[in-house]
Amino acid sequence: MNGDPVSWLMVEPGWTVVNAHGKKVGKVDEVLGDEQVDIFHGLVVDGKEILAERVADIHEGEIRLAR
């Protein structure tokens, strides 16, 4: 992972998602949240919902899961 962390508002479909060990687990299909009040609910990755509490870090182009 390179660079500084970015906001969940920057995440776009197609970004890579990796597990806590750095192994690729899929790509973002959709970002779940409410931009109006800046609440991040999670992601849809390869058709499966991942809750926000599982997201450890967001860097441009890549999201790392906590577990």
Regions found by a protein language model. Name each.
Residues 1-67:
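Peripheral interaction segments used for macromolecular assembly
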